[in-house]
Amino acid sequence: MGKNEEVKLLGIWASPFSRRIEMALKLKGVPYEYLEEDLENKSSLLLALSPIHKKIPVLVHNGKTIIESHVILEYIDETWKHNPILPQDPFQRSKARVLAKLVDEKIVNVGFASLAKTEKGREVLIEQTRELIMCLEKELAGKDYFGGKTVGFLDFVAGSMIPFCLERAWEGMGVEMITEKKFPEYNKWVKKLKEVEIVVDCIPLREKHIEHMNNMAEKIRSA
């Protein structure tokens, strides 16, 4: 990385979408400036950099603006070649992309929908979420991480979203969503993630995060 390179990340402390970008930048050893945003009072910088989406994360690299977390992760991987994030094999790379979409589209949609329901109306959505997470359980069989022996793209996407976001929301509601008995590979993977310094450095503080997720769930239910 050149000495005069500018790398800025606009994000939110509790957002898995910006946490995963920090994980990738730390894996690559790329120095960056982090700018905390407030989506209820969006900064003029965020609106200028992302006038259409108006969402985080936003990466700024030498004046170029990159949005959407999956796109940003791939940009980081292609710009700084060392410590690859995506699998080198084309088939494995395509599979990682498909599973990342499963996480951020299907699991997120059903998982967050479960937060909006009362206890009685939550059961069907919880079971649907478990069925989707079982796809990840099968993919992790016999592996330390999704890519094998080292963390990468899908670990950042799934890790930031499920154990370190959705599970905390469910914990706040008293729901044990992903048991070790039914999901042994998944739980082994989460334990391995907690041993990775760059991941741990980017995980929001647990109690503060659970409180935040509880407040968000209350807002969803009362909307």
UniProtKB/Swiss-Prot annotation:
GO terms for biological process: glutathione metabolic process; toxin catabolic process. Keywords: Cytoplasm, Detoxification, Phosphoprotein, Transferase. Its main location: cytoplasm. Glutathione binds at residues 15-16, 41-42, 55-56, 68-69. It is an enzyme of class 2 (transferase). GO terms for cellular component: cytoplasm; cytosol; peroxisome. Residues 89-216 form the GST C-terminal domain. GO terms for molecular function: glutathione transferase activity. Gene3D superfamilies: 1.20.1050.10, Glutaredoxin. It catalyses: RX + glutathione = an S-substituted glutathione + a halide anion + H(+). Its EC number is 2.5.1.18. The modification Phosphothreonine is found at residue 150. Residues 5-84 form the GST N-terminal domain. Coiled coil: none annotated. CDD domains: GST_C_Tau (cd03185), GST_N_Tau (cd03058). It holds the Pfam family GST_N. InterPro entries: Glutathione-S-Trfase_C-like, Glutathione-S-Trfase_C_sf, Glutathione_S-Trfase, Glutathione_S-Trfase_N, GST_C_Tau, Omega/Tau-like, Thioredoxin-like_sf. Belongs to the GST superfamily. Tau family. May be involved in the conjugation of reduced glutathione to a wide number of exogenous and endogenous hydrophobic electrophiles and have a detoxification role against certain herbicides. This is Glutathione S-transferase U6. It comes from Arabidopsis thaliana.
